[in-house]
Amino acid sequence: MAQPILSQKTSPSAERRASREESVIKLASKSASYIALAAATVLAGAAMADPDEDQLVINGEIEIVTETKAPAHVENFDTIYSGWRFRSDETQAFEIDDFDNPGMLGVEAALDVWATAEGSEGKSCADCHGEPDEMAGARAVYPKWNEEAGEVRTLEMQVNDCRETRMGAEAWKYNARGMTDMVALLSSVSRGMPMNVAIDGPAQSTWEKGKEIYYTRYGQLELSCANCHEDNYGNMIRADHLSQGQTNGFPTYRLKNTKLNSVHDRFKGCIRDTRAHTYAPGSPEFVALELYVASRGNGLSVEGPSVRN
């Protein structure tokens, strides 16, 4: 006698598990669609708006070059522009007079620190370097190769070297407020001088590393620095006017977070926006990237502390 065929029933727990798996698949598909759409939006741009033709003169006397011929090593455009040229008239106006520039509050704070003795040696910055004006031109050539240390150094790295070896003081954290204020002071006394970062000789390998990072796609959005600041500068994206990502204006006071921001702050934010794990401020990767990006602005004037959105 043939045995009856038993019907196979799915248990309630199995049904719930299958339902959850289906939901996860749908959510993953939807997330992938959103990511693809976001990347496409960045690459396509909502609208095109060329940089304006306004000229920047600070305090009626410091002429800032905001447009010039691209250096020979910049391969994909002929003209370079300061980020100031991509800002609204209202934002641009903050830089015309130091009394209106909120970034100058950091400069004033650094002036006090400049003359303050610290550390086991009881020395101040002024004891070795004199008045801040005597540092005019330093910002224009950093990052630069340090022969004694055998490495490319940013201004922040050099400031900490002075604090530790000459003053016997504790090093500042790379993105500490005091550090960014001090770099803003050093930038302010170099305003109007042309960026002239050296990329040959022993600095070349670091520069090449920075270039590789610049063109590498990162994160879930698979975007590189070049995708925004080279391929799509001038495009409007989420009401923001994409610039060429020049660093001549750093440190930059951002209206968005109401503070001075270092170059590495901005690098970190950009990579984070691609939904990637980011390098740390002061890391060899960001030092290399800063050298490369700074060299792309050779010929533009030192402008920091600048004001941006």
Predicted regions and their residues:
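Extended amphipathic alpha-helical interaction segments
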Residues: 188-240
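Short cysteine/histidine-rich zinc-coordinating motifs and their immediately flanking basic loops
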Residues: 136-143, 237-243
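N-terminal carbohydrate-binding/catalytic regions of secreted carbohydrate-active enzymes
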Residues: 107-109, 113-115
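Extended intrinsically disordered, low-complexity coil regions enriched in Ser, Thr, Gly, Ala
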Residues: 120-126, 238-241, 307-308
